Amino acid sequence: MGEQITRIKRELVHSGTILDIYKDTMELPNGKTEEWDFVSHRKGAAAVVAVREDGKVLMVRQYRPSLERETLEIPAGARDSVTEDTKVTAARELEEETGYRSDKIGFLISLKTTVAFCDEFVDVYFARDLVKTEQHLDDAEDIAVEAWDLDDLCDLIYKGRIQDAKT
């Protein structure tokens, strides 16, 4: 370790709605070259652990095409732009997806979701003192809001029924 691996070429292979896929040519410390795939998530994302006054955690259930099934997750979404503060994103996604808002949102952690080949990050926040409003789902979203006890959520995680990394 210690010697650098250097990218000597980057070729855009696909440009999608929220991500770009590149083929990188990398020079290894031994002088050989290899091609590596790289996925650039253009905007980053935010998620929020929202806890009601009764101690229940707000979760969203939605269909995920990549898994071909519904998942149970904390509310989350991509930033509207690369300059949007992720705290703003978290607050917006909380209200859009759950129909709750909060003025008490604090930063928890920044997650790098797939460090081997992707630069996506998700900043996770904690929200309390929730106020009920209305869901404002995007046209393509079909989200059910559920309130869970933390112990029950932990049980689902240990049983492998919640597999979403940010959750």
Predicted stretch roles:
Residues G2-I5, K32, E70, F107, ...:
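Nudix hydrolase/Nudix homology domain
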Residues M59, I74-F107, Y125, L137-A140, ...:
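The catalytic Nudix box helix
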Residues R10-A47, R52-E53:
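Acidic, metal-coordinating catalytic segment for phosphate/diphosphate chemistry
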Residues G2-Q4, V39-R42, A47-R92:
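Conserved Nudix-box catalytic region and its N-terminal flanking loop in Nudix hydrolases
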Residues D20-D24, E34, E70, F121-D123, ...:
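Short beta-strand micro-motifs in enzyme catalytic cores
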Residues K23-T25, A50, F126-R128, A147-D149:
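Short, well-ordered beta-strand micro-motif
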Residues K9-L12, S110-T114:
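Short, solvent-exposed loop/turn elements at beta->coil junctions and helix N-caps
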